[in-house]
Amino acid sequence: LFPKKYLFPLLAFVVPLLVRVIPEVLMGPYVVGFDTMGYYVPTTLLWLHGGVSLWSFIATAPLLYTLTAGLALAGGSVVWVLKVLPSLLLGFLGLAMYGYARRGLGWSPKKSIVPALVGTLYFVALRVSWDAFREELALIFFFVVLMLLVAKAGGSGKFSWKRYVAFSLALAAVVLSNQVVAVLVLGVLLFTVIYKLVRESRIDAVRLIVFSLPAVLLFFAIFYLSPTVPEYRLIFGFPTTTDGWLALFGYSSYPAMLASEAGFFLYCFLPLLPLAVLSVRRFGNFQMRSFIVLILIATLVPMVSPSDLRIVMLLVYPLAFYATEGLSWLKSVHWKRFRITLLRVGLVYLMLVTVVLSLGFMVMTPENPFPYFKEGVNPYIYTIPTSMLQNTVSITDCQGTVNALQWLKDNMTGNSILLTHRVFYGWALTTFNPDQVFLYEFGNPLNAATTAAQEGYSQIYLIWWVNGKGWDGQPTVSSAFHEIYQSGEIAIYRYTPN
């Protein structure tokens, strides 16, 4: 018989994994997530072709790319590695959250499963798992760090080399996975050290400092080197440039930024707040409170890259614990006349909110989205997409993209170049060699074409949607580009200077 003590940990791993498989199956052979195709595919392919220096390797916080490149070298294609890995990451995140609730907070198995499922299946958590794999990998180790930070060795409180070495390794893994989550975990650690110095054991505080030093030094090395990798650059303030990417994510002023963040918070978490606010005073866990405070502090910093709204999404994890504690409070309230507890009402409400929103997010298409995510209701479609069934293009445009690129490969001559927006860059690298592709990021393809012409290319091509159907704030292309091939709503254009 299956040991009962393993039932809830198994559920914490298997349920999120199986749910995350759903959009992968519906997408067929294509990956899920903008960053998946826009960044993870091309970066992994470039690494496999030797296109990374030692310093760039360190600067990217390379743990995820080491995994994807290693698995691809072991025999899997990059695309299939990035179809299988997201489900596994979400499963391990559920298990890590369960472990923290069980061992770090001392909750019962039944209670511990609730934050593990809410923190992986609520639509905001699924949005993180849609393409933020580096953050997700870091969060797995984040909760391992918190568990080791709080749990006493063997319950005795004595010094344990194993626990502190594991703590140091897990902390380093966070830093090697994602810089934003690294800042949060180091912030929680700093608050914990200060608290121990003031209220508890100074010896424990010194031990934490000593065993944190390797990760701290690694963090500063990555921070120092990160400007060498353009896609991981930090952008603060309110840029006035007309760069296409900044036009989508930048703010005109500080009040506009705060208003956008407040609206985004309510859009994401209003369904969870009725339960979460019940435990604001009851749930006094120092690490979760520190987690929330640090995220709120980060949202006050005028930041465009990484997006401040993506940082707000990380509140789903502490709020999952607060909502669970809110349910515990409802357990003590009874309606004697109706023989029903508010706990049951709260559980049904939480299940309905999670299932309805998440299922709609996973199975509806971008062209026919669930009402809560459609444009007009959702003013944040560049952060919360209309559906999970897309990557850099909609599920309905994936085959057209493959057809267009294959046609161009069959018909492109020697001294030619393909111009690609970040949207089509990963797609192009799965078909062409890197030296046949010119990435112009989120900018103007006409400027890129002018540059390519000056570099001596005889034929300059562009892949984009047919005119009037373009995404990312560019519905049409310049008249200097003439359509020469179309598949569905995806077209190949040839540059002809006016």
PLM regions with names:
Residues 135, 183-184, 306-341, 346:
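Hydrophobic/aromatic-rich transmembrane helices and adjacent perimembrane loops
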Residues 10-17, 208-217, 281-304, 312, ...:
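Transmembrane alpha-helix segments characteristic
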Residues 9, 13-140, 385-395:
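Active-site lumenal/periplasmic loops and adjacent helix-entry segments of GT-C-fold
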Residues 105, 142-163, 280-283:
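Membrane-interface transmembrane helices that cradle and orient dolichyl/undecaprenyl
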Residues 2-5, 156-160, 197-210, 273-295, ...:
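Membrane-interface helix-loop-helix junctions at transmembrane boundaries of multi-pass membrane enzymes
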Residues 20, 24, 35, 59-61, ...:
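Transmembrane catalytic cores of multi-pass membrane glycosyltransferases
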Residues 1-22, 207, 341-349:
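Start-transfer (signal-anchor) and selected internal transmembrane alpha helices
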Residues 90-95, 128, 135-137, 349-498:
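Extracytoplasmic
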